[in-house]
Amino acid sequence: MGKGEYDFSEMFIVWNTYMDRAQATVRTHGDISFSQGGSFYDVLYGIKHYGLVPDAELPAGVMHGETLSNFSEFSSVCDPFVEGITKNKTLQTSPDGTPLWRNAMAGILNAYIGECPETFVYEGKEYTPKSSAESTGFNPDDYVNLASFSHHPFYEKFIIEVQDNWRWSTAYNLPIDEFMEVM
C-alpha cells in the first residue's frame, strides 16, 4: 500500500468482536458459542465496521500490567455474565434484551481490555478509529478467506462449520496442494 508501517491494536478488534459476539449470543438465546477464539473474518469485519487504532491507544495486557493479554480471568467473569443474560426472561419478548446488559458488558470489557478511544492523536493529527483505518488505504474487501476442505466442492465459497465462525463468513475452497501453494 506504500503508506508506511503501523502497529495497530489487536485489542481494539478483540473488544469490538467480544461485544458483537455477546450480542449475537444474546439474540440467539445462547445458540452461538460464546468463548475464546475467532476467525480470520473477525479481523476484516472489525476493521471495516469499527476501524483501527494504534497499539499505544489500547495495548495488550495493559490492564494487568503485562505485555500480553491473559483472558483466563476475563473468561471466568464474562462467560457466566453472557450466559446469565441469555437465560433472562426479558429476552422472550425482546431479542436484544434491555440496553442495560450492553453497558455492563462494556464495563467488563473496559476492565479487562481497556476503553476503546473515540478519538486519538497520531503524528499530530486527530483521528477516529474509522478515519484512521481509511487513512491507511487498507480495504478489507480486497481480501478473501481461503480454506481446503474435502467435504465441500472446490473452487466455490462455503461457510466453514466451526464454532469460532459465529459470523458465518465464507471461505473460498481450494484443493490442499493449491491452498499450500498460495500460502
Would you name each region that the model predicts?
Residues 1-183:
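Catalytic-core signature of thiol
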